[in-house]
Swiss-Prot record:
Catalytic reaction list: L-seryl-[protein] + ATP = O-phospho-L-seryl-[protein] + ADP + H(+); L-threonyl-[protein] + ATP = O-phospho-L-threonyl-[protein] + ADP + H(+)
PANTHER family: PROTEIN KINASE SUPERFAMILY PROTEIN-RELATED, WALL-ASSOCIATED RECEPTOR KINASE-LIKE 21
GO BP annotations, alphabetical order: cell surface receptor signaling pathway
The protein's name in its UniProt record: Serine/threonine-protein kinase ZRK7
Keyword annotations: ATP-binding, Kinase, Nucleotide-binding, Transferase
Gene: ZRK7
Organism domain of life: Eukaryota
Residue numbers annotated as active site: D205 (proton acceptor)
Phylogenetic classification of the source organism: Eukaryota, Viridiplantae, Streptophyta, Embryophyta, Tracheophyta
Organism: Arabidopsis thaliana
Protein kinase domain residues: 80-269
UniProt-listed SMART domains: TyrKc (SM00219)
Enzyme class per UniProt: transferase
GO molecular function: ATP binding; protein serine kinase activity; protein serine/threonine kinase activity; protein tyrosine kinase activity
Record: residues binding ATP: I86, G87, V88, D89, R90, F91, V92, W93, Y94, K106
């Protein structure tokens, strides 16, 4: 399976090769349709045909991602009503219903601090690539009609691990058997992220709010916006330090204000 390269989000009935026509992040119109060109990982592409986003591998295989209209998103969330919100991070998670199905809607609201716009599209690309894994929150589709992409995911009945018990409720400690099950399943998902693709991809933001649980207590890893690929033949990559205080390695997180910090990764299999 190839990883992502030229992500071409094209709202038209015909897939066009925009690689020679656009710069990263450039938006323009042609024939009444809006186009967005975005460059990410190597050897693949994300395109849109007849309302369906497609991630293409170098072998020509496509992974369809459904596109939802802004009307569907606004109706599902009652115009992003806060009473529908079930979690807040760099984005807001809303519980909604689309076509009689409960869904989880991820909306990047406002200007996330120190957040590269590329991360929005990386989240779509990596989430789609990972959605076949049983321990990853399945991406159902997205909406490109807002200033930033809105992601639509499967709805995990028990919610985020960080909020088990709900606001104001007495939270009973999870049984050790459940904790070990969650740890193993997330480890399986991370191992898949590290080893399934031609380049190792590092999540960089593992925390309780990014782990969801379904009705069977099956763990689901989510939120790949901060993920980064390790160049072939390398053990690490230089990038701006990012993550969440309290969940990263202390020395690493203490350098959050550094312009760059060497991220060294060794994958254990």
């Amino acid at each position: 399976m190839a990883h992502i390269s030229d992500i071409k989000l094209i709202r038209t009935d015909t897939t066009l090769d925009l690689s020679q026509k656009a710069e990263k992040g450039m938006i323009w119109t042609m024939g009444g349709a809006s186009y967005l060109y975005y460059n990410a990982y190597d050897h693949g592409s994300l395109t849109c045909r007849c309302g369906t986003l497609l991630i293409a591998s170098s072998g020509g295989k496509y992974n369809p991602i459904r596109t939802f209209s802004s009307h569907q998103i606004l109706e599902a969330t009652n115009n992003f009503d806060w009473s529908y919100a079930i979690g807040v991070d760099r984005f807001v998670w809303y519980k909604g219903t689309i076509e009689n199905r409960a869904v989880l809607i991820k909306y990047y609201k406002g200007e996330p601090f120190n957040f590269d716009p590329d991360n929005f599209y990386r989240d779509i690309a990596v989430s789609s690539m990972m959605s076949s894994h049983k321990n990853v929150l399945k991406l159902l589709g997205c909406c490109l009609e807002f200033p930033r992409p809105v992601l639509v995911c499967e709805y995990p009945e028990k919610g985020a691990l960080a909020y088990i018990g709900g606001a104001g409720e007495v939270i009973k400690p999870l049984a050790w058997s459940v904790r070990l099950k969650i740890a193993k399943e997330i480890a399986d998902a991370v191992t898949y992220l590290h080893t399934e693709f031609p380049r190792t991809i590092i999540h960089r933001d593992l925390k309780l709010t990014n782990i969801f649980l379904d009705e069977n207590w099956t763990a689901k890893l989510s939120s790949f916006s901060l993920s980064i690929p390790i160049p072939e033949g390398e053990l690490g990559v230089e990038d701006i330090v990012c993550g969440t205080q309290g969940f990263g390695e202390p020395h690493y997180m203490e350098n959050m204000d550094s312009i760059k910090n060497r991220l060294m990764v060794t994958v254990i299999t």
